[in-house]
Swiss-Prot record:
PANTHER family xrefs: ATP-BINDING CASSETTE SUB-FAMILY A MEMBER 9, ATP-BINDING CASSETTE TRANSPORTER SUBFAMILY A ABCA
Keywords for this protein: ATP-binding, Glycoprotein, Membrane, Nucleotide-binding, Repeat, Translocase, Transmembrane, Transmembrane helix, Transport
Binding site for ATP 1: 517-524
ABC transporter domain: residues covered: 481-716, 1288-1521
GO cellular component, as recorded: intracellular membrane-bounded organelle; membrane
Role played: Transporter that may play a role in monocyte differentiation and lipid transport and homeostasis.
Official protein name in the record: ATP-binding cassette sub-family A member 9
Residues that bind ATP 2: 1326-1333
Location in the cell: Membrane
The keyword Transport belongs to this UniProt entry's keyword annotation: yes
Organism: Homo sapiens (Human)
Glycan attachment positions: 120, 195, 949
InterPro entries: AAA+_ATPase, ABC2_TM, ABC_transporter-like_ATP-bd, ABCA, P-loop_NTPase
Tissue expr: Widely expressed with higher expression in heart.
Amino acid sequence: MSKRRMSVGQQTWALLCKNCLKKWRMKRQTLLEWLFSFLLVLFLYLFFSNLHQVHDTPQMSSMDLGRVDSFNDTNYVIAFAPESKTTQEIMNKVASAPFLKGRTIMGWPDEKSMDELDLNYSIDAVRVIFTDTFSYHLKFSWGHRIPMMKEHRDHSAHCQAVNEKMKCEGSEFWEKGFVAFQAAINAAIIEIATNHSVMEQLMSVTGVHMKILPFVAQGGVATDFFIFFCIISFSTFIYYVSVNVTQERQYITSLMTMMGLRESAFWLSWGLMYAGFILIMATLMALIVKSAQIVVLTGFVMVFTLFLLYGLSLITLAFLMSVLIKKPFLTGLVVFLLIVFWGILGFPALYTRLPAFLEWTLCLLSPFAFTVGMAQLIHLDYDVNSNAHLDSSQNPYLIIATLFMLVFDTLLYLVLTLYFDKILPAEYGHRCSPLFFLKSCFWFQHGRANHVVLENETDSDPTPNDCFEPVSPEFCGKEAIRIKNLKKEYAGKCERVEALKGVVFDIYEGQITALLGHSGAGKTTLLNILSGLSVPTSGSVTVYNHTLSRMADIENISKFTGFCPQSNVQFGFLTVKENLRLFAKIKGILPHEVEKEVQRVVQELEMENIQDILAQNLSGGQNRKLTFGIAILGDPQVLLLDEPTAGLDPLSRHRIWNLLKEGKSDRVILFSTQFIDEADILADRKVFISNGKLKCAGSSLFLKKKWGIGYHLSLHLNERCDPESITSLVKQHISDAKLTAQSEEKLVYILPLERTNKFPELYRDLDRCSNQGIEDYGVSITTLNEVFLKLEGKSTIDESDIGIWGQLQTDGAKDIGSLVELEQVLSSFHETRKTISGVALWRQQVCAIAKVRFLKLKKERKSLWTILLLFGISFIPQLLEHLFYESYQKSYPWELSPNTYFLSPGQQPQDPLTHLLVINKTGSTIDNFLHSLRRQNIAIEVDAFGTRNGTDDPSYNGAIIVSGDEKDHRFSIACNTKRLNCFPVLLDVISNGLLGIFNSSEHIQTDRSTFFEEHMDYEYGYRSNTFFWIPMAASFTPYIAMSSIGDYKKKAHSQLRISGLYPSAYWFGQALVDVSLYFLILLLMQIMDYIFSPEEIIFIIQNLLIQILCSIGYVSSLVFLTYVISFIFRNGRKNSGIWSFFFLIVVIFSIVATDLNEYGFLGLFFGTMLIPPFTLIGSLFIFSEISPDSMDYLGASESEIVYLALLIPYLHFLIFLFILRCLEMNCRKKLMRKDPVFRISPRSNAIFPNPEEPEGEEEDIQMERMRTVNAMAVRDFDETPVIIASCLRKEYAGKKKNCFSKRKKKIATRNVSFCVKKGEVIGLLGHNGAGKSTTIKMITGDTKPTAGQVILKGSGGGEPLGFLGYCPQENALWPNLTVRQHLEVYAAVKGLRKGDAMIAITRLVDALKLQDQLKAPVKTLSEGIKRKLCFVLSILGNPSVVLLDEPSTGMDPEGQQQMWQVIRATFRNTERGALLTTHYMAEAEAVCDRVAIMVSGRLRCIGSIQHLKSKFGKDYLLEMKLKNLAQMEPLHAEILRLFPQAAQQERFSSLMVYKLPVEDVRPLSQAFFKLEIVKQSFDLEEYSLSQSTLEQVFLELSKEQELGDLEEDFDPSVKWKLLLQEEP
């Protein structure tokens, strides 16, 4: 075992390199990540550098605005309401004001009736609305006579230079009459209330703007938008880091942690890389901020620091969300929404001062803190003297506080990430209690004893009984893993599920132990517990005296443990060598030993030829080998392997077996498997688990003897043989022998184990019966498969050539009934009515595909959420405009209260409130006036001696300068230019002061208000709305109409084609749903547009029917355009987001281009014609811009132009439909039927001459080739084989070695000929790259043969074939559809009428016992049920040709047996035939009538199982178990004497295993005679002599595979998928 040292630094560097390689190799994702970020930067620079306005205002002296009555405008009328005696009296006195002489003043009964003013008067109307005698509000038309803003924002320009003069917004109140009207009305109210006239006093009030200090102001709304874009500037990076981290945590991080990965290394690796990205982006954003002068006075370093800290806080926020949310897309979406909403939450800080406590609390949300920081920088520009730069002279305490909060947020999010990562429940790993950090064991590592003694440790073995073989004495004291009363429970839907129920046993050093059991037995659960991935509910486990319940011990265990989980553990974007190097560093292998260790693993697993290939390009078997290689890195002392050879071809499987056998000394190896032969060959001890409990344990010989059914005698016959006489002969020697299988070519008997003494005489008589038709015979011992099934209480069939039907005669009636029922189901298909075809079938298929699309759409939450989000975004501008419209259309009052600007008495100083400065320049006291001011609840500061002028100190919001004499005061108002409503507020203060002097307790209150004029032109408004929502509508289609890419990836489209689907039916079925959904969305958008728009806008579109018809055509054309894109890029990624963005950009640029084009209407028309996404908005623009000039351009009338524009989208639809038809026709996939819409016919079976002549072929191959030639010549259709493959050859273009070399052709198959007869199943075997997959593809029509011909029953004569039955290796199923929905869809596609389909589905479901799964979605099914479903789909509709590719891969032995029974029942004595490919030799032996083995693209041999064993089998296997160990050496000498060429394979304890050449064994009678003598002489407990297995024959032939032909392994189209078992 290699020395290990876990180092956070080494692990962080390794993971950081991995992340960088991921970014480099996943160029599309990285490009998008950076592209969107740079586009944002570019947009901000180009847009805001021109749009953004910065007002740098120098210091200005005070400005005199003159007297109130200096207002002399005459272009207005005055209206007041309600008209009453009091209001009429007030307004009569108002008319006496000097500036109102001769003006019209009208009374109205109420405010609503004033709307008639807009109809009767074209001039401006001033509305006075009285609420009572002393309260009123002045209403002006919006944008007239008063500022549009209610109040100044803290960063906007309150004064600016206009025509070389300084103009302040607050002066509008003075200059445009508001203050004059206010003064007149106030004077009238005072006179009526007190009988004292103050008209002259108020008319003589003068206004002065205080001195203006220098300030820098931003350009209003543009600044707000810029800050919003700054808030989301890092969102692209943060989205991708959220997705990447969540994906890794979900799929692989737990396994890496089990290998020794430190959590801090994982977070650091991602944090450091994205911190670099943030650094670059922060630099760019700071440069943009400074260059666009968003921030003027603050230095670059401060701005950069703000952005950098904000970006870092977002990274840790993404980390936190990845822990709390388990789904990658949802994590990214939530983080983005949090950034947006928390950032927007900070916008009030731009306009007002927030309470300190609230601001500090909300700053715990980093986007809020960033927004506050940006607001502070802008306020500094607004408030600080322009000559005093922040970096040099100011201490930016507020900015530093904000930066501190961003640092605090970063640390807080990181701590919360680590905390929740430890306590939140996860699928794997140990979870801590919420208060784990309060325990001392968390902070201090306690020492431990070298040996932990368990209570009753010596009793940890299961209770001894006859089901458990006693452990050999030599292993006593070598207990490495001790398991005691282990239980594991999971939370089920209704109740707790027990996965393990008190498991007790030991695992020994120096032994290979196999865990066997059905799916769900608890094997994976046990291995996960032993590896530390899972925590047991109760019980204890020790591994070399380390207790798994202690975290410290788990870390120690990980140092000497290697784990190969059921799922592959590697990164697809890394090469084989890079994966090994990464995991070596994670495991803590010393840096100088990493390369040596990686090279060792590569060599031991013979991966030199794939070490530089990306893992994602490897086949499933090669990925499995890589996962095993990762497990053995560091030469671990304990190996835990969960199905380590699943998906491997036999040759690779044997390499791993040999590696494990060679390294088992001084090591502990525990593995689980569904491949029973693997356990039989490899494991020294087998442990059977059933439903979470141990059932038995022992060696193969022990288990076979106790639960085996005996020897299998297989006789290969010719036509002269009389089966009855042979059976009589066998029973003559062994009376209790049973005939278990009988066919024309084969008889199989079971001979009891205890009758081995009768074997010599039986075999001697069989040798003498060669003239009775026995060509050959063989014998094999019972298999562990049979033991397994017997333990499970199931019926068995033989894997070793027994055949199924004779065995069924010996099994219970239940299984016979089931299979008879299945045969009846399959035969009943012939009785059903003929399947439909032509247009009727096309309609049925369209409805079936539409059903699939609708059901998929219901479950595609990601797409639906995205569509909903886009729908919402598209109406944000309209919603804002609607709110704006509603806000200003309705009257809003704005109270002009002194509390807005001035402190109350006793109130603490609070920005922006100040004292009201009162300056007495009367030369006498003004106590009465001051007393009256104080009664208004205003804190005043009095300059009693008049030493100040009131205009040079802008630290006050306002000042009142009192002059005149003691009784007749004159007033001057000085206002701070930052306080917009200061003049009317102070005028009310003066008015109430005068009112108080006359001892009145009343209070005058003036409000400002506006009304909206309803005679605006909305044509531009309509186009601006349309400009936004229709481009957004175009971006919907990629999220709606690209689901076909998923069908191509899942191979569902290919499966549908093979099942007889018309290409046009597929696309029209998709369109039936997609077009409807898209049109519904478009219709909703139009309805929303009408709802949000003013009434005038609606009437611009005069013919709604035309718009709807145009929309239907537009929707159809855009959906089919997306179909064309999907078809072209069907082998790539979906990339809906990219295409959505592309459509959006195309439409926006088209709008801009048509608006700017110099050809006017003609350019708009041709733009609509040539740019499909622009068609709808172009048509609407055409309808709205039809004029005599445009009619002259086109030489058409208005109606003709409308109809022409209306036809454009339909023309596009037809064009894209035709393009789609051409693409389908040229895709080189063979159709099963003629398409009635696309008019595409199945290709004729063209014959291509083979350039190679067969040379040096075996006699069997030559005979098969002759059968093929004869079959092609037979004219009787009933005698034609169901599959004829004649001289098939397939060449692929190889890769160039360099730019100047020619492509070397890669030959996948060479002159392959065979035929499959009716009722026959032929097995096609071969090493990876031998050509099996290519042969299958040529038969299905996926690949066109270079030479040769394929003829399928139905395609050469008689009726058309219609469809094939195909059970692919990869489950081509839709995860969210149920079993019943799959069956109904495929029945419809294959042409079954609804009634026939229901009958067939019911019978098949009943026969295969799928009733309980009918309503279950496929994604919830076990692998075995999925394989059953794929098989049922392949035979549904009674196809004459069925192709089965690894039909039982991934199933447990029980499921495999059931599947094999079903396959045999399906094809026995029928008109159907099947071609089966498999890596599992037991499967071929169980179901195949004949087997063909391919080597290097050629058929190497073909024939029955027994024929191949006899012809190519070279060895017999002899196993012997001794009672007396002292006899071991003499026995060994005796075996070598009797069998001189015997080779000893295993020798430990009492078991001895030898390999005997065929020539030493033949005749069998002599061999058994010798062994019987040995049994008596040496007192053997038992022995067995068994013939070579098919697997051994295959391995011998596979050694001929040439290295150069292995290149097909690396072709992504040739992959073996690892099918996982689902266990609790």
